[in-house]
UniProtKB/Swiss-Prot annotation:
GO molecular function: FMN binding; NADP binding; NADPH dehydrogenase activity
Name of the protein in its database record: NADH:flavin oxidoreductase FG08077
Similarity remark: Belongs to the NADH:flavin oxidoreductase/NADH oxidase family. NamA subfamily.
Positions contributing to substrate binding: 58, 211-214
Expression triggers: Highly expressed under trichothecene-producing conditions.
EC category: oxidoreductase
Residues bound to FMN: 53-56, 88, 130, 264, 370-371
Pfam families xrefs: Oxidored_FMN
EC number annotated for this UniProt entry: 1.6.-.-
Function: NADH:flavin oxidoreductase; part of the gene cluster that mediates the biosynthesis of butenolide, a mycotoxin that shows antibiotic activity but does not seem to play a major role in the spread of head blight in wheat. Butenolide is derived from glutamic acid via a 4-acetamido-2-butenoic acid intermediate.
CDD domains named in the record: OYE_YqiM_FMN
Pathway: Mycotoxin biosynthesis
InterPro entries assigned to the protein according to its UniProt record, in alphabetical order: Aldolase_TIM, OxRdtase_FMN_N, YqjM-like
Length: 413
């Protein structure tokens, strides 16, 4: 008896066997929604517009990603976000938020991250990495241990080597007073961002994101709350955005033209909306300034601006009025300012499929979710179910819902 030859074809390029995913998980197969409409950036096509936001795991050893990162991200990646983003990754050893943060300040840190990109690509998925420096918010302990405690030397911290644009503590009397950056420090910082971006490309990442939000170093340069310099990196708006643009220019000039660059910004420090805080912080980073920056970024090769908020001072958390989609209005203001010159994503409290669809239908290009993916790695399928559409899942998962033989097969070459 002759049998039809049906092969469980292997994914191309993977160093181990795993079934090919064609089309990739997260691809809409029936129905019509904006959430599951593909988007192409610099020739890179993402199967849907629900992106995984970066999520710090505080689980690395000396900056080296571990099996936790592979399994945590892998469980989400295989279920099909349009793009998955690795957590804030330090470009300098002393730029970590905690001693357990991931880093890319040395070549040895490439290989553990390459395991993650290799897995993502074996599933026909796209993956990016967020490059960061914590500045005056460095050398903290993991957030489940304390709200704002400093990591002492005894637990691997570096409280005597914290740096920032100006010698102003994150919280007076709680955090150490940082050392103000010298001009030489700034040059080294720019070169280290570039070196980390090059390592990210070597590690196989499809997308690079620059972290200029949440009160970390680049946000510290942007905001007058933390930047009181009197040289060309402080004072005026043009001076405060200078280091961000210089870093972007260096990276854009050295990485492949086909690699998208994203920039995450805090649209506001939130002090502009509250009279109590406005008196204490008469000058801060505002939505108006964010819109102005967002209009400049595409001229420097940025493809998407991710709009978040807050983080510059503990009191900004008090000023935030959190709730469902609480940052979407900020993203809408940015999108109105930039038009079609650059893509804009919204993040924060977007925890249902209907809400995500509403945000995208309003003109935002991409929605991102962080905690909700952490709570439910199958968020893509959950959103699709809510919206009444079908999306492809990994074959190993999909068949158990659709039945045997429903995906068809391709003959072996």
């Amino acid at each position: 008896m002759a049998y039809e030859i049906i092969d469980n074809i292997a994914a191309e390029g993977a160093p181990y066997y795993t079934p090919a995913q064609d089309p990739p998980a997260g691809t809409q197969t029936s129905g019509s929604t904006k959430v599951f409409t593909p988007i192409t950036i610099r020739g890179v096509t993402f199967p849907n517009r629900l992106f995984l936001a970066p999520l710090c795991q505080y689980s690395a050893k000396d900056g080296y990603a571990t099996d936790w990162h592979l399994t945590h991200l892998g469980g989400i990646i295989q279920r099909g976000p349009g793009l998955s983003m690795v957590e804030a990754t330090a470009v300098q050893n002393h730029g970590r938020i905690t001693p357990q943060d991931v880093g890319l300040w040395e070549d040895g840190q490439i290989e553990p991250l390459k395991r993650i990109t290799t897995f993502a690509h074996s599933q026909s998925q796209k993956i990016g990495i967020q490059l960061s420096h914590a500045g005056r918010k460095a050398s903290c302990v993991s957030p489940w241990l304390s709200i704002n405690a400093v990591a002492a030397k005894e637990v691997g911290g570096w409280p005597d080597n914290i740096v920032a644009p100006s010698a102003i503590a994150q919280e007076a009397g709680v955090n150490p007073v940082p050392k103000a950056f010298t001009k030489e420090d700034i040059e080294e910082l720019k070169n280290d961002f570039l070196a980390a971006a090059k390592r990210a490309i070597r590690a196989g990442f499809d997308v690079i994101e620059i972290h200029a939000a949440h009160g970390y170093l680049l946000h510290q340069f942007l905001s007058p709350v933390s930047n009181q310099r009197t040289d060309e990196y402080g004072g005026s708006f043009e001076n405060r955005i200078r280091v961000v643009l210089e870093i972007i220019d260096l990276i854009r000039g050295e990485i492949p033209e086909t690699t998208p660059i994203l920039v995450r910004v805090s649209a506001t420090d939130w002090f502009e909306y509250d009279a109590q805080f406005k008196d204490e912080f008469p000058e801060s980073w505002t939505v108006e300034q964010t819109c102005k920056l967002a209009q400049i970024l595409p001229k420097h090769g940025v493809d998407l601006v991710d709009v978040s908020s807050g983080g510059i001072h503990p009191k900004s958390a008090i000023a935030i009025k959190a709730g469902p989609a609480y940052q979407v209005d900020l993203a809408k203001q940015v999108k109105k300012a930039v038009g079609d010159s650059v893509l804009v994503s919204a993040v924060g409290g977007i925890k249902t499929g209907h809400l995500a669809e509403e945000v995208l239908q309003s003109g935002i290009d991409v929605v991102r979710a962080g905690r909700w993916f952490q709570q439910n790695p199958g968020l893509v399928r959950a959103f699709a179910n809510e919206l009444g559409v079908e999306v492809k899942m990994a074959n190993q998962i999909d068949w158990s819902f659709k039945g045997r033989g429903k995906n068809g097969h391709k003959k072996s070459p």
